[in-house]
Amino acid sequence: MTTIRGNIPSPNNANVVLTNVPCDSTVYVGAAVRMTLVGVAVNALADSAENANVLGIVEFKATSTLCNIRVLGVTEKIFTGLDVTKTLFLSPTVPGGLATVPPTSVGQVMVPLGQPFSATEMLVFKRDSVIRG
């Protein structure tokens, strides 16, 4: 068994990354994305159930309209300043954004997306969403 950082098992066996996915030009590395009906990744937003249906986190953009999306596992070192004591949620105000505080307004959707693994990496997992009512 391969380990990283002491005795923590390597997460390589639990990695799911979708490669060369068509994406909107506004999508950026580190963004939480959802898929449109025509199969294009767009920035997700916790303002409605439809917009908050997150597929994963963009890890790489080969072109302005082609990206790799992490669905499960530890991301590449694409972030800065993550706090390992905080759960990350989908932002209700910044398209594709991550927040350390869950949305609380009526109609917004609480979507837990993952846990920082280090200051630069995130363990991506998607839990059930909760629509605030």
Task: List the predicted regions and their residue ranges.
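Glycine-anchored, exposed beta-strand/edge motif detector
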Residues: 2-133
